[in-house]
From Swiss-Prot:
Name of the protein this chain belongs to: 5-oxoprolinase subunit A
Subunit record text: Forms a complex composed of PxpA, PxpB and PxpC.
Name of the gene this protein is made from: pxpA
A Pfam cross-reference name: LamB_YcsF
InterPro entries found in the cross-reference section: Glyco_hydro/deAcase_b/a-brl, LamB/YcsF/PxpA-like
Gene3D superfamilies: Glycoside hydrolase/deacetylase
Gene Ontology biological process terms, A to Z: carbohydrate metabolic process
NCBIfam families, sorted: PRK05406.1-2, PRK05406.1-3, PRK05406.1-5
SUPFAM superfamilies: Glycoside hydrolase/deacetylase
Enzyme Commission number, as recorded: 3.5.2.9
Alphabetical UniProt keywords: ATP-binding, Hydrolase, Nucleotide-binding
Function text: Catalyzes the cleavage of 5-oxoproline to form L-glutamate coupled to the hydrolysis of ATP to ADP and inorganic phosphate.
Molecular functions per Gene Ontology: 5-oxoprolinase (ATP-hydrolyzing) activity; ATP binding
Membrane-crossing segments per the record: none
């Protein structure tokens, strides 16, 4: 039977601001990425998200981003790799504290937004992220964009397990990278198209680029976004689609 991990970014509320559909999404995913306070989230939200994830037996990962709350971590920052290392180490350590306090064990690290996209094409950024993981806990998995040589090489250098990720509701360029969110066609808004794309990636190992070309994708985890208007409905549909197609949802080891 084909197996796949379903992951989702959660814990993005902070202070008086409520974001996402965390409680409703949790039953349909096998791993989550928790915002660590830089691009979203706050200490109380981090604790609550960890506790809820443990109740659902969902794998917990850190979701470090740039210190850009106003831009939700989606804006590139021109900082040296040494600062990226510091940012990532700091955020992993913060979440790990909450996970340990709740009696759990952290599973992975997935960079957020601009940090993720920069790492996918910039070996120095990817190296800084992998090095931070290695220094704090080399058993943590690294979630990174499928086919990214930067992620692959960084994981190999530090002997970290890379979990190659694809996206259910994002479009792809011909080189296998994600279409920038600044482009109108960055998101797949039609639910049927997104379901079709996910099945193609999981069952057939490819995705159609925005130019209509087939791009090979060997995905081990699929990212769902939990903050959209129909996010819960979409998560439920993907979950049931996988069941109907004999695709087992499970956490990567």
């Amino acid at each position: 039977m084909t197996t796949i991990d379903l992951n989702c970014d959660l814990g993005e509320s902070f202070g008086a601001y409520k974001m996402g559909n965390d409680d409703e999404i949790l039953p349909f995913v096998s791993s989550i990425n928790v915002a660590c306070g830089f691009h979203a989230g706050d200490p109380s939200v981090m604790r609550q998200t960890v506790e809820k994830a443990m109740q659902h037996n969902v794998a917990i990962g850190a979701h470090p981003g740039f210190p850009d709350l106003i831009g939700f971590g989606r804006r590139n920052m021109n900082v040296p790799a040494s600062e990226v290392y510091d940012y990532v180490l700091y955020q992993i350590g913060a979440l790990d504290g909450f996970v340990k306090a709740a009696g759990g064990k952290m599973h992975h690290v997935k960079p957020h937004g601009a940090l993720y996209n920069m790492a996918a094409t910039n070996p120095e950024i990817a190296d800084a992220i992998a090095k931070a993981i290695y220094h704090i806990n080399p058993s943590l998995l690294l979630y990174g964009l499928a086919n990214s040589e930067a992620f692959i090489q960084a994981a190999e250098k530090y002997n970290i397990t890379l979990v190659q990720e694809a996206f259910a509701d994002r479009t792809y360029k011909q080189d296998g990278t994600l279409t920038s969110r600044t482009e109108e066609n960055a998101l797949i808004k039609n639910e049927e198209e997104a379901i079709k794309q996910v099945l193609q990636m999981v069952k057939e190992g490819y995705v159609n680029s925005v130019n209509g070309q087939k791009v090979a994708v060997q995905a081990q985890t699929i990212c769902l976004h939990g903050d959209g208007e129909k996010a819960v409905q979409f998560a439920r549909r993907i979950y049931r689609t996988f069941e109907n197609n004999e695709i087992s949802i499970c956490t990567p080891k």
